[in-house]
């Protein structure tokens, strides 16, 4: 039996989590494995119940589990707190640090039935596309030292440091190539090796790792060209391997091509494939409690959990196929519906996906 730490959190988190668990219960029955769901508070809910966004009991539960299924955290209720104590910073960042979740998988898929929601022209979209951004999360310019500000007046100077160890590049490259093996077998490494010394090392190490995956095709692209090519011809990409800052930008650009944050799943993993799986969107407090949130991102995050942390790839495929089948039938929540008067609510979308399984 696999043990799942369920951290529903705040806002729409509990609503979409309920639907994801409904789908997981159905898929475990279908495929004959067993999951144990253990719930704990996190984020604003934990501040209210325990006084901190990440209680020790929640952290202990996560450490004793095989994976973490996360909802969302944050909301206006806790915005008066110092930034370091607010749910977003005080819950997610410590979880990532504690479990060394250095690898971020961000899929961006345009389903054939939802191509109208994509901002690109129909001739560019075709029947849709499926891109996986693999982003290094714990190093690079966001974490580099020294950083600071010196001087005064017009001579004031601010600086940051970008740097990567060979080992850090190697481990994220392995994650990208391993993911590509489960997909179409193609990696595009995004760098700026023409001007940045850090990226020269990045490219060298990626080339070394590529030799261990002769069945995976490797291309290199400069980040400025990558941002253009994503909107010019997204079909050329499958797995995009990026450093922290470039991945931050590229993954958000790719995400917006899908047409809705309610479709975007995310996984953060360590070298043991232990991971935290969550929707890429936020807690959406403006619609929380109304039963209209799109649960697909949480459901697809659960599918990623099955694939990458638990080893149930066939079950993950079944969930993703059920989501696509449901959308093909024209069943949509308000955020992706062409005719909002025909939109289903959160629970109805969950029920439809279970039925499609």
UniProtKB/Swiss-Prot annotation:
Q: Where does Mg(2+) bind?
A: 224, 248, 252
Which coenzymes or cofactors are required?
Mg(2+); Mn(2+)
Kindly list the positions annotated as binding substrate. 96, 106, 135, 224
Q: Which UniProt keywords apply?
A: Amino-acid biosynthesis, Branched-chain amino acid biosynthesis, Cytoplasm, Leucine biosynthesis, Magnesium, Manganese, Metal-binding, NAD, Oxidoreductase
GO MF annotations in UniProt = 3-isopropylmalate dehydrogenase activity; magnesium ion binding; NAD binding
Among the GO biological process terms of this entry, one is: L-leucine biosynthetic process
> What SMART domains does the entry give?
Iso_dh (SM01329)
Query: What note does UniProt attach to the cofactor annotation?
Result: Binds 1 Mg(2+) or Mn(2+) ion per subunit.
Q: Which residues form the signal peptide?
A: none
Which GO CC annotations does the UniProt entry carry? cytosol
Look up the EC number in the record and give it. 1.1.1.85
Q: HAMAP family from the xrefs?
A: LeuB_type1
Q: What's this protein's name?
A: 3-isopropylmalate dehydrogenase
Q: Which organism is it from?
A: Desulfotalea psychrophila (strain LSv54 / DSM 12343)
Organism placement in taxonomy: Bacteria, Pseudomonadati, Thermodesulfobacteriota, Desulfobulbia, Desulfobulbales
